[in-house]
Amino acid sequence: MFGVIVNPVSGGREAAGLAVQITERIAALGEESRIFETGGDGDAAAQTRAALAAGCQSIVCIGGDGTICEVAGELCHTGATFYVVPGGTGNDFARAFHLPKNPMAAFEAQLAGDPVEIDCGRMNGQSFLNVSGSGFDVAVLQKTEELKAVYPGEKAYRKAVLSVLGRYKAFEADVSIDGGAETHETCTIVEIANGQSIGGGMRVAPDAKLDDGYFDVVVVKKVPRMLIPLLLPAFMLGWHTKIGLARVVRAKNVTMRAKGMIVNLDGKLLRV
């Protein structure tokens, strides 16, 4: 049986109609399905547990990276098959699999393909599929939340990026890779990346792979103010790792300590 996890009011209530289309498509396959509606933060995880308890072995998530992250955290090591239907602003996880932007086309592509196993990261007990980030991307997400009351999601994000670029300050952190000695870093961004992109296509970890058993740890050190305007195009093209703005280390375990640290787990902010 398929369980369909959906926030019925997301996308101007389009998600609810999409969930019905998906259940109709599942019925055409001769399979049963049940819709599980979410209501707020953390509810996607609860509804996923309910779906598993109801006997669902295939889980469809309609949502953005944050909702997908919540659902995936409950599916690790369960043996359930996970279908992602992109319905957020950035949809970076769906982008990593080159899924079509059209939600139904993305679902059809997964039905036609074979399941693959991927890695799942854990940060202070919280799961993530794509990235755990600190620094610039956290500041952008915080500003985006402020602007959402005025602008729709994608426009709010673009305006937030431009706003933060002009005033962002680097932060201090102590970083240890795979149990090694701590190094003190003055950072613009630290990304512990399982996937390649954030923010709807900024390629912060252009060589990361979802199934290689490693994180790509991307450290962008303090950038001189005159070079800050280069950050955005460098991230979009993945050039920051090639022109000396960043260093990349592959690792299985990362420890980072910073005063008042907030991390971005697949689009959701967590104070650690």
Features from the language model and the residues they span:
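Short beta-strand/turn micro-motifs composed of small residues
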Residues: 6-8, 63, 221, 258
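Glycine-rich beta-strand-to-loop/alpha-helix junction loops that act as flexible
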Residues: 8, 62-64, 85-87, 194
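ATP/nucleoside-binding phosphotransfer catalytic cores, i.e., glycine-rich phosphate-binding loops
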Residues: 15, 177-179, 184, 209, ...
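Short Gly/Thr/Asp-enriched flexible loops that form oxyanion-binding sites at enzyme active sites
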Residues: 67-80
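Glycine-rich phosphate/pyrophosphate-binding beta-alpha loops
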Residues: 133, 137, 191-205, 269
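Gly/Ser/Thr-rich active-site loops/lids in small-molecule metabolic enzymes
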Residues: 148-156, 200, 206-227
